Every structure is written in structure tokens, then in C-alpha cells.
């Protein structure tokens, strides 16, 4: 209820902000948002691989990376992990993972991450392997070293408040300059599935600052697109490169939002008669699924309405599979067979139409989006050279 109320407040604030300014491509803010969904992160990973390949082709540069084109990359849960993989620098100050490396990461490590602990008390998975592999991959890198602005959400169960890790917040809140592996584990620590994560940083005065964090989906309910747009708006207001952008002027935003799939209309749905017999535990599991699905639909609805109201619907692309069935609906089924099915879902999704009203496929839409990103990057570079 509180989440819906906050969405509505932001929604009407956006609609109330009008602007007749025509956006200059070089001054537009580019935003990538990636949903949570556990092992279903394979689906957006396929999309990212395709998009990065298109950018490399358009710019004739095999070393082009997504972080070179987006001003803000935001994610929650598995989307936060993807965000870190494509923005955390290696020893050459380039993203340590190309988009094509992400699916192999899931295929190799997924079965070990989602390896049932066997305990009847506590979470289903102990999280030890997940934390270990994140430490190995991300090392000692901290938020301030990210190659572009990031927005990774989590929730502090001790303070009962969301915690959003961004570079732009560090001057005011240096305690947020945490290690990326701590952030990634925290945003993925879904209640029931993984233990909460405790770690410390230090304030500007050198005092210890404690975090007691769980999955970012608790804060953003699975879809971080509105969060990512909010961070982008603040970034635009503070950066002179975006001087023409007004507060909450989404007409000057380019947003790509990637989902991890929702269930088919008739898969894992329930009747009132069935639900009337449920106990607290059964409701707990069902509510998480229902809340994530509702969030995905409603966030997309709000954002679509805003962009359409600004006659800027081509500036927003939501890539989502809405017909998952069987094992592909599970966020923790990391069996080889299911992961291969998720790869197929992502590849098939590229060939599907963006909407029932348009023959344009996601593949075609992403090619168009890649051209916009490329042109904007070149215009920005030319402007900076004068």
C-alpha cells in the first residue's frame, strides 16, 4: 500500500511538470534499469549481450561496453549483480565483464549459488558461495570507482529504511562508499532465500557505520526503473552537461528497462476458494510472487503513461517476457535444463513484437535504441572537444 501511494505521488508530480523544450540528443540522459529475479537474470543478460553487440557493430569498436553509453545503470537483486558486472572496473579501468560474459557466469555459478542448504531453520540457501564468488570477481572495488553512475537498492532491516548506493550520494553520505561485493550480496539477499548481510563502513568522521541489509526488491519491489529515473534526474540537475533539463523532465530521458519475466496469465494463478485454505507460510510465498508481478506491471504503466503524455514514447523501451511457464517462473531453479530454457526465453523474446499494436520486434527496437545511444555519444564527444 505504501509503495503504491509513493508511486502515485511521483506519477502525478511528473505529470504536473510540463516543458515544451525539444530535447537535444547530446543533452539527453541515458538510463538502463534491470529488474530482480534470481536465476531469471539470464533473460536480461541475453538482451544486454545483444545490445552491446549492436553498439560494437554501429561504432565499429569491439571494445565498446554498455557503461560507455549509459549515464545511469540501476538494478535490484540479480539486476544489481548485472549492474555491478558491467560497471565495475578491471585493472585497465574497463568493465571487468563484457555483456557476453554474463550468461556463462550464471551457467557456471548458478547451481552452486542455489544449492539447497538442507536446513529446516533459516533461509533456503546459506549464501556462502554467492558471497565468495562476488568477492573473487569484484575484489576491493568500491562504489566511487564505478565507471558510470549506478543505483543499486537494498533495505536495512535495523533502521527499517531503503538504502540506495549511488556515486552521486557519496559527497553527502561517504558511508555509502561500500565494497561492491557487499552491495551485490545485500541487494540479492532475498528473505527466505538468503541470509541478511551485515557489514560496516566509516563516516566522514571515522565513526563505524553499520549495515544490516536484505534484498533490494524489498525497497523497489523488483523493478528499479523509477529509482533509476530519480537518480538520473538528480544527476542531470547537478551536471552542467545537461543544462537544458528541467526537474523531472522525462522528455529528455532515454530509458531502457529490462525485466526478468512474469508468469503466463494462467500459470501459477489461484482462485479465491484455493487461497481461503492457505496458512501464513503459503501466503508469504504467494504474496512475494504477486507483489513482484504487480510492481512490474504498474511501474511500466506509470512510466509508459508519462512518456506518452510527453509525446516521447520512443524514448522508453521496456523489454519483458510476460508468458513464463513451468520451471522458468522460479527464481531459484538453477538446474542445467532450466537455465537452458531461460536462455531460449531470452533469445525468443528478441524476435517477439514489442506490443500487440506494433509489428516492431524487440530486436528491431534495440537496434534503434543502439543507434540513438551511439549518435548521442558521438554528439557529446564532439561538443566536449570544442
Curated annotation (Swiss-Prot):
Patatin have a dual role as a somatic storage protein and as an enzyme involved in host resistance. The lineage of its organism: Eukaryota, Viridiplantae, Streptophyta, Embryophyta, Tracheophyta. It is an enzyme of class 3 (hydrolase). Probable lipolytic acyl hydrolase (LAH), an activity which is thought to be involved in the response of tubers to pathogens. Belongs to the patatin family. This is Patatin group M-3. PROSITE patterns: PNPLA. Residues 1-23 form the signal peptide. Its EC number is 3.1.1.-.
